[in-house]
């Protein structure tokens, strides 16, 4: 009971204290609060409530009242005044879109916009430094527009808006470089995309124009994403995406009008937009009118927020031009101030406009034109020609005019050319000439700022080859050749671009920095309407001051061959029909040249090809290189996959037919400076297929992005079909695409030069150090050439595929690149590949195996054949089967011979020992006899008597021997004393016994 009493007392006390506090607050005034709408309920209704301003405390706020329905909105030029809940017109100096908001000021990032830089690589490499590598990537405000990143990070510009009803978002953009992927998509508050993913890819801009993109929005929360992802290899820098004038429609109401930004004004109430202040005026924010500058000393550009002081005139403020030829065919150099003129001549440091030069003779007409007695040159009529110095003449019989354009004299701009100036950030140079004629050349103009694009266009309706080569296949249709130079101290660039059938402009080549006098040729293979564009930019950095006005590009001559609407500067021999009716020309069949004597078509000799731009004379048929033959049309040479050559007095034959299919090498991975993983994909067609180029590389950007871009299937800008080509592959897990990205396809080899075991052919050399080898068999080198030239490869690209025998690698084997050049090239112009496979071994011959004969067993002998210890051959002759032949065994006779030999040896040894012992005894007896005889040499010898004396016994037996012993015979032979024959006497004396 006590607890309840205490609680009740506490409540009563609080009420008393609150009432006392409210009594002490002042009554709310209109300036102390503002009105807001509550959130809409399920019925689409809401309430208007009064909310105290920050820092204000008052009592007596107005009671809530029912507000306008949630879908209510005011018209353009009006805003909803919540206090009265009525639409009111915007005051002068402000504007309103009614149901929309607009962002056209980009001096800083507008409120509500945010930047998010991410790295969409999903693999593990470089995971530690990826977040930091993109921390400096963002969208950058540039005043009138906002600029995307130009690296290979993924950066999103995000803005969230809540719509009470369905609306739309639109923006202007400039998107020129397909090396950046540009997406615009919308998510709801659950981070779910609200439209088809195939619609999120933004189309490339046409010819540097600002394009408009609009997408419908649903009611509710819409999170808008402008996302760019760079696909950059090496040191390449992409052109960023530019966005301006973002407009969002569908906002339920606008509670206030937007002020006009500096440089604009609105002079009427209820304006839906602001007007730009004209030149030499300025305005502040929320201006009702523009204020004029003091024009004698000040100036301003369109849309200026202040006036600038006019500087003294310098050489940067004037330019010179050549006047058109007058009726006397005279011209002169005159000087003019750059318009609009912003400098002051009366200042002490100012220069004066130089006087005009003396009149000079006009340069002659360009080839194909003639002077008609007026100040202009006229084109020669059809069927006639002129060198520009003489009247037009009719081509002789048996000849036809050479059509084209050759511009080398620049007194006036030709009729099929135009010039303009363009800047993405301002309109200072709009209406200016981007290029100026200068007699023997045409040069870039002054422009408004240093980052202007100075544009020169040449329109060609189509291309048609001469009549004599109309039947040729695979021949070029025409060429565009221009001679130029860049005179720069800055980072200037001259771009050469091509637009086919007025679809989109693609960059062909760029020439950065200072370039000396040089020539560039672009070959045309497809008949279409072309717009060739030269665009010169002094620097890509926007600057208020002019620092590089003296940087210029000069084009001395432009030559276009085989143009349909061209003129003729000469005539060429053409082929005549068999009946030679009149002088009508007939087309030669494919692979035929025009004989100089008869002007008839004759087929090129075997294994020669016809030059694409010269068919007159037998010398137009060029012999094919070693190991190659011409195709049926004599338009190119190719290898039949059969190669034969002599090495160290040995003829080696190869058969590469099993390698004739298109081979693929995926080399990598490599990584950009930001860590993007990419691969180099090479497709190569080695030989065969009748000379048809089978290697195809395709840019699948359209497949990846789903862009609806019209493109012919044979458009060379999307598909490269040749002998060897290269593409840059970014795996699907690298940037979050649904499939791997293939881009930057390059033609590396469109002409086959020959195959040889030598290390060089027609100026292309492969060093032995590139692919070291210890084999006795040298590599077989296939030499290719790409005729397309670039600024870095003035002679075109060259490719060498070295075929190396490796019996351990069966089938297709392995293809590798030089160890020191992982991209197959070290200079970007010469590419080298090593193809190791057993199929690259020479065909086997009889010298590649040896014969081994077995022992004779049971009257039979087997002969086996085995490959040499290191088999370096394939296919060819087969290893012979085992051979069995009859034989006679020699085991028995060998045993008999051994027995007889052993017996004979023992017998000889025994006889030798016997006779030697007997000879020793005889020598002993003889020596004793000699000693006895010497002791009695003073005594008379006893008379020899054959009779037996009295008293003596017949005991002595005398034996006479005239034969030599075996040992003595051997001695006599050794001493060659055959005349001394000793008599052996054996005595038996009783006297000796008595002694």
UniProtKB/Swiss-Prot annotation:
- Its induction, per UniProt? Expression is down-regulated by ras.
Q: Which domain of life is it from?
A: Eukaryota
Q: Which residues cross the membrane?
A: 896-916
Matching Pfam families, A to Z? ELAPOR1_C (PF23089), Ephrin_rec_like (PF07699), GBD_ELAPOR1 (PF23031), GBD_ELAPOR1-like_3rd (PF23032), MRH_ELAPOR1_9th (PF23087), TNFR_ELAPOR1_6th (PF23091)
**Topology: which residues are Extracellular?**
22-895
Q: Which UniProt keywords apply?
A: Cell membrane, Disulfide bond, Glycoprotein, Membrane, Signal, Transmembrane, Transmembrane helix
Q: Name one GO biological process term.
A: negative regulation of nervous system development
Give the glycosylated residues. 24, 136, 245, 372, 527, 649, 683, 700, 758, 883
GO MF entries: BMP receptor binding
Signal peptide span: 1-21
Give residue spans on the Cytoplasmic membrane side: 917-995
What tissue specificity does the UniProt entry give?
Expressed in the animal half of the embryo during gastrulation, becoming restricted to the ventral ectoderm at stage 12.5. At the neurula stage, expressed in the anterior ectoderm surrounding the neural plate, and weakly in the epidermis. Expression is especially high in the presumptive hatching gland and cement gland regions. Surprisingly, by the tailbud stage (stage 22), expression is limited to the hatching gland and is not seen in the cement gland. Conversely, in tadpoles expressed broadly in the head, heart and fin.
Q: Keyword Coiled coil: yes or no?
A: no
Q: What happens when the gene is disrupted?
A: Morpholino knockdown induces severe developmental defects including dorsal open phenotype and the reduction of head and tail structures at the tailbud stage.
Q: What does this protein do?
A: Functions as a regulator of the BMP signaling pathway and is involved in epidermal differentiation.
User: Which family is this protein grouped under?
Assistant: Belongs to the ELAPOR family.
Specify the protein name: Endosome/lysosome-associated apoptosis and autophagy regulator family member 2
Q: What is the originating organism of this protein?
A: Xenopus laevis (African clawed frog)
